[in-house]
Amino acid sequence: LIPDPEKVRVWEARAPAYDRLCRRWEIFSQLSNHLIDLLPASLQGPVLDIGAGAGLTSKILLARYPYCQAILIEPSEAMLDIARANLAGRPAKFLAMGLDRAAEHDLHAVAALASASMQFLDLEPAFATLARIIAPGGYVAFNLWWHHWEETAKRAMEGWRDVAESVCREAQLPLHVLPSRTPIPKTRIELTNASRRHGFELLSEHRDEYPTPIGFGVDFQAMEPNWPVKGCAPEVREALLTRIHELAQGKLEPLVSTRFLLQRTTEGR
C-alpha cells in the first residue's frame, strides 16, 4: 500500500497535463459515473476516494449525492492542489498520502471508490485497511482497465502507436518508446481471497466497452514531454502531435474496463 516514490514523482510532474486530459476526454467521467452508478441511491455520509487524482470522481459523487462528503486520498500533492481548486466550496477533505497511512487519521466511511487507481494497490493489504474504515453494510466500488484484470489482459488499445509511428516515419524521426513495465493483472482468485478474508462480499461485476477515439491514447502518451520524439524543439513536437491527431481523426477503439461492487458484511473470516 505504500506509494512507489518514482510513480508519485511521475504523477507530480504530470498533474496539470492529467487534469487537462480528464477535462478533454469524456472517458474519465464515464468511468467515474458508471462506478458511482453501483452505489445505492440512499447513500449518505463520508465516502473515501482512493487515488483521487485531480478530484474528478469526488466532484461527480458530490453532485449526485448531496448528503455525502468526500475524503480524497492521493499521494501527489500537485494532484491534490488541483483537486482543491476543482472542489472549492464542496464538502471535501484532502489527504496527501497513500492508503497505507489511513490508520493515522482514524478514517471512517460509508463507502470507498477507486476509479483507475486500484491497480496500484495490493489487494490483500488494501482490503485489510478498508475493513477498518468501512463499517458493516458499507460499500467498496472500483474498476480495473483491461490490462489490469486477468480476464481482459489480452485486449490491446494501442491505435495511437500506429499513427505515431507513421508520422515519425514521414518526418524521418525516431519514435521515442517510453519505458514501461508490463503490468501484472489482478486475478479473480486474488480478489476473492482478499475480499472474503476481510469481510467483503462481491455484489456485482460489470464489464464495459467504451468506443474511444485514438486521439485519447495520443494525448495520454503526450503527458510525457519527451514524446513522440525525444529532445526535439517545442515547435517540432507541436507539429508532430498535430499531424498525429490528424491521422487519428475519426478512428475509434474499445477501452475495456471491469467494475466491481463489494459490501462489507462481517469482521472477516
List the model feature ranges, each with a label.
Residues 1-41, 56-60, 79:
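Conserved class I S-adenosyl-L-methionine
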Residues 48-50, 54-102:
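Class I SAM-dependent methyltransferase SAM/SAH-binding core
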Residues 110-124, 146:
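A short SAM/SAH-binding and catalytic strip from SAM-dependent methyltransferases
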Residues 125, 139-209:
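Conserved catalytic/acceptor-binding region of the Class I
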Residues 129-136, 143:
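Conserved helix-to-beta-strand junction in the class I
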Residues 203-252:
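C-terminal helical/coil "lid" or tail adjacent to the Rossmann-like core of SAM-dependent
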Residues 258-269:
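Core SAM-dependent methyltransferase catalytic element
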